[in-house]
């Protein structure tokens, strides 16, 4: 699915260390865009998305739905786990979060269109295989959609915006049809500014009555939670890819638009926005109104209300419809996405590369381990003097691949 207009494809091919599960130690996941990735701080969980078909003239295809890839943020190594149970259909543009090592997945686009189903997967399970569970929630759910955003606050998942079908039930907020969707679909779609809450204890859907001026309807925007504020930046509405910044107070449900001082990032969709401290958000990549892929990075300082350009070594690696997760080590881990114009789908350059952005100083332990590995020939004879947990970390780091660091 594109971020508002184009259907790019319409068919589909048929413990903490995660050591005990039925898995395969492969090099890395396939290249992809439109996937989801969530983190528990030490591991990044990757599911879904799609890639280009290698046979010219055939559609892009969704990646296998039973595959869950786990990236160890400390060692830089991947592990594939095959899941069972109520496995979601292969999709792109879904929305996912990880809370207490439980993965929640909502919405997306599959071979038959948009969905509003809700799934969960408990990665803490001691079973030999991880199991998906489809949750039959109560209340009025959001409409079927993809490319929406989510905030996590207390025991609530708060979903905002997206692109999909007209709601079947009466909901609070605005829905704007995409006129072009009438041409190529029997189920026309559009953008919305709807806010929906799911209580993860009762699994009941509800809608808050918000105050203030809400953002315009949009899709392919990016959301981030800091404290009791749910931030949203950019996204696409009709022909515009925007650079406005808003937050929703998740206690009072009041919308506020922020007008930062100084320079600001250009308007974009399909970007990522990641909280990296109690006062900073990290923005990377995206796709402009004139269809240019972006490789710029910015930090937004909440207390100063200003954007600051972030210098990094990945300026030759634009990404859009990628994912980004923060680690416990002060890094942002970007995975996958497309490196060129995604809408020219037979030429789309999907990626399976990891890009690492160091947004905070590394810990002394991390610096020491990196020094040990850097000078491994000189220090190898002394490794057995290390505490067992540090020796394990050093040994695991060998064999790492597909990681480009900053």
Curated annotation (Swiss-Prot):
Pathway: Protein modification; protein ubiquitination. One of its GO terms (cellular component) is Cul2-RING ubiquitin ligase complex. Gene3D superfamilies: Kelch-type beta propeller. One of its GO terms (biological process) is ubiquitin-dependent protein catabolic process via the C-end degron rule pathway. Keywords: Kelch repeat, Nucleus, Repeat, Ubl conjugation, Ubl conjugation pathway. Pfam families: Kelch_KLHDC2_KLHL20_DRC7. It comes from the Eukaryota. GO terms for molecular function: ubiquitin-like ligase-substrate adaptor activity. Its main location: nucleus. It is found in: Nucleus. Autoubiquitinated by the CRL2(KLHDC2) E3 ligase complex. Kelch repeats lie at residues 31-85, 92-136, 148-207, 221-259, 271-311, 322-359. Component of a CRL2(KLHDC2) E3 ubiquitin-protein ligase complex, also named ECS(KLHDC2) complex, composed of CUL2, Elongin BC (ELOB and ELOC), RBX1 and substrate-specific adapter KLHDC2. May form oligomers as a KLHDC2-ELOB-ELOC complex; this interaction is autoinhibitory for the E3 ligase complex as the substrate-binding site of KLHDC2 is blocked in the oligomer. Interacts with CREB3; interaction is direct and specific as it does not interact with CREB1, ATF4, ATF6, JUN, FOS, CEBPA or herpes simplex virus transactivator VP16. Substrate-recognition component of a Cul2-RING (CRL2) E3 ubiquitin-protein ligase complex of the DesCEND (destruction via C-end degrons) pathway, which recognizes a C-degron located at the extreme C terminus of target proteins, leading to their ubiquitination and degradation. The C-degron recognized by the DesCEND pathway is usually a motif of less than ten residues and can be present in full-length proteins, truncated proteins or proteolytically cleaved forms. PANTHER family: KELCH DOMAIN-CONTAINING PROTEIN, KELCH DOMAIN-CONTAINING PROTEIN 2. This is Kelch domain-containing protein 2. It comes from Bos taurus. The gene is KLHDC2.
């Amino acid at each position: 699915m594109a971020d508002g207009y184009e259907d790019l494809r319409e068919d589909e091919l048929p413990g903490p260390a995660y050591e005990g599960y039925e898995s395969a130690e492969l090099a890395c996941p396939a290249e992809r865009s439109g996937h989801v990735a969530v983190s528990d701080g030490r591991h990044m969980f990757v599911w879904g998305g799609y890639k280009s078909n290698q046979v010219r003239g055939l559609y892009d295809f969704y990646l296998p739905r039973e595959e869950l890839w786990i990236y160890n943020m400390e060692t830089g190594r991947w592990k594939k786990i095959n899941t069972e149970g109520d496995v979601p259909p292969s999709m792109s543009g879904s929305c996912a979060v990880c809370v207490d090592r439980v993965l929640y997945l909502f919405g997306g686009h599959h071979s038959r269109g948009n969905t509003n189903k809700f799934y969960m997967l408990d990665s803490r399970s001691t079973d030999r295989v991880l199991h998906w569970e489809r949750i039959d929630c109560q209340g009025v759910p959001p409409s079927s959609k993809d490319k929406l955003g989510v905030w996590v606050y207390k025991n609530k998942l708060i979903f905002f915006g997206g692109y999909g079908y007209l709601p079947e039930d009466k909901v609070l907020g605005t829905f704007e049809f995409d006129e072009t969707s009438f041409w190529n679909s029997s189920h026309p779609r559009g953008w919305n500014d709807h806010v929906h809450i799911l209580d993860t204890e009762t699994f009941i859907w509800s809608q808050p009555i918000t105050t203030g001026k809400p953002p315009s309807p949009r899709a392919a925007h990016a959301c981030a939670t800091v404290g009791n504020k749910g931030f949203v930046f950019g996204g696409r509405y009709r022909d515009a890819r925007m650079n406005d910044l808003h937050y929703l107070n998740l206690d009072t449900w009041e919308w506020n638009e922020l007008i930062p001082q100084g320079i600001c990032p250009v308007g974009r969709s399909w970007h990522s926005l990641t909280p990296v401290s109690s006062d900073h958000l990290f923005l990377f990549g995206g796709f402009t109104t004139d269809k240019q892929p972006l490789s710029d990075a910015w930090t937004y300082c909440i207390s100063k209300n200003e954007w600051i350009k972030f210098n990094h070594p990945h300026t030759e690696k634009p990404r859009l419809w990628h994912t980004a997760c923060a680690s416990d080590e002060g890094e942002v881990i970007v995975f996958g996405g497309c490196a060129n114009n995604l809408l020219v789908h037979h030429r789309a350059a999907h990626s399976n590369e990891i890009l690492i952005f160091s947004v905070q100083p590394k810990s002394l332990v991390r610096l020491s381990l990196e020094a040990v590995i850097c000078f491994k020939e000189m220090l190898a004879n002394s490794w057995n003097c290390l505490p067992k947990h540090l020796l394990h970390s050093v040994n695991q780091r060998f064999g790492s691949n597909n990681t480009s660091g900053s």
